Amino acid sequence: MAKGVAVLNSSEGVKGTIFFTHEGNGATTVTGTVSGLRPGLHGFHVHALGDNTNGCMSTGPHFNPDGKTHGAPEDANRHAGDLGNIIVGDDGTATFTITDSQIPLSGPNSIVGRAIVVHADPDDLGKGGHELSLSTGNAGGRVACGIIGLQG
């Protein structure tokens, strides 16, 4: 079993800790709490780069090793990093558990060293008809991010 963690921070006061657990060749379970967000849905994605030299803007596009278009987590045609939305309550906090088979912590498509990003707006899961739907889910700006590292 492999474990990972990402600590999210932002200049807007968004904070959180995300934990990743990967069992052998199975799915990865993502659990976390993020606070300081506007209530509602917020796009949640693994981005290709672990570079935060320019804040969340330098984390690159969604992690997409198979060259697919953006989609929902349950879609066959989706970026590996497309994790859908997290739901933020009236208190500005999201607590969530996501299980996904396309984000391993080892092997050629490992997400270790990449970034996890929370977006300002809901992810339309590639179905919104907007010009950005098939690339970003039209999820808006990047409000918080953290680099995924291995955890002992």
Curated annotation (Swiss-Prot):
A Pfam match: Sod_Cu
Cofactor entry: Cu cation; Zn(2+)
Major localization listed first in the record, in broad terms: cytoplasm
SUPFAM superfamilies: Cu,Zn superoxide dismutase-like
Binding site residues for Zn(2+): H62, H70, H79, D82
CDD domains noted in UniProt: Cu-Zn_Superoxide_Dismutase (cd00305)
Entry's cofactor comment: Binds 1 copper ion per subunit. Binds 1 zinc ion per subunit.
S-S bonds: C56-C145
Keyword Disulfide bond: yes
EC code(s) of this entry: 1.15.1.1
Catalysed reactions, semicolon-separated: 2 superoxide + 2 H(+) = H2O2 + O2
One term of GO molecular function: copper ion binding
InterPro entries: SOD-like_Cu/Zn_dom_sf (IPR036423), SOD_Cu/Zn_/chaperone (IPR024134), SOD_Cu/Zn_BS (IPR018152), SOD_Cu_Zn_dom (IPR001424)
Record keywords: Antioxidant, Copper, Cytoplasm, Disulfide bond, Metal-binding, Oxidoreductase, Zinc
Family: Belongs to the Cu-Zn superoxide dismutase family.
Assembly notes: Homodimer.
Name of protein: Superoxide dismutase [Cu-Zn]
Organism of provenance: Brassica oleracea var. capitata (Cabbage)
